[in-house]
Amino acid sequence: MEANNNTKGILFIMIGMAFFSIQDSLIKYIFEEIALFELYLGRTIVQATVLISIFLITKKKFTLKTHYPFLTLLRVICFFFGFSFFYISLTFMSLAMVSALFFSCPFFMSIFAKVFLKEQIGIRRWSAITVGFIGVLVVLNPTLEDFNFFKLAPVACSLCYACSMTITKYTSEKDNIYTQLTLLYIFAVIASVIIFLISGDGKFNNFSDPTMQFIFREWFVNPAVSWPYVFVMG
């Protein structure tokens, strides 16, 4: 039974990664037409709409009450910053390089699983993870002469994602997936709206660098072009 569940889990991960690849390609295509957190807000609204539709169709019951308030807050913060780091990295790095650096995630996740979840990880898995992490170091090219700290953005994303997934694994014992998703979307909307109220008019966009413009650009400048893609990504 456990082997069958592992196979299903791997299959779902592969399907999810395929969809993420499509999303990442679309982000690289439209990032000059939209602000970072406008994109984040749009995706969240679409995903929340899908989730609400599932609730209405299946008549599933859920609650906003969590048994792990602190861990839940930490999880949604990690998700928020993790995706932000990833989106930012797509503005100045190739999709292939970002994806390669994101593969540092299994390294962090395995450490967290061992330390915090007390899971047993065999020598074969550690060997595969180590080889993968060496590949990440090769891509980073961490030499003192020309090391680019901006390349750490997808690695920071991996660290945040590994942290959030570890917390999700732990809290799933009492909090169901619908509660966790709903709280994630609520936090993302609140955080995005706050950022919009502070900088949504573009008053801090005094930069010529495309990445910094992506972060501080005025919101809703060209929604007819950007939001159809946001809808697809959601």
Explain the meaning of each model-derived region.
Residues 1-15, 49-74, 123, 186-233:
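Membrane-interface interhelical linkers
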Residues 17-22, 52, 76-84, 106-111, ...:
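Hydrophobic/small/kink-forming positions within alpha-helical transmembrane segments
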Residues 28, 37, 146-204:
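Transmembrane alpha-helical segments that form core, pore/gating elements
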Residues 32-38, 85-102, 177:
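Structural motif at transmembrane-helix junctions in multi-pass transporters
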Residues 61-96:
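Specific transmembrane alpha-helical segments of multi-pass solute transporters/efflux pumps
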Residues 88-93, 140-149:
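Membrane-interface helix caps and helix-loop-helix hairpins in membrane proteins
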Residues 105-127:
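C-terminal transmembrane-helix exit sites in multi-pass transporters
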Residues 124-141:
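Hydrophobic transmembrane alpha-helices of multi-pass small-molecule transport proteins
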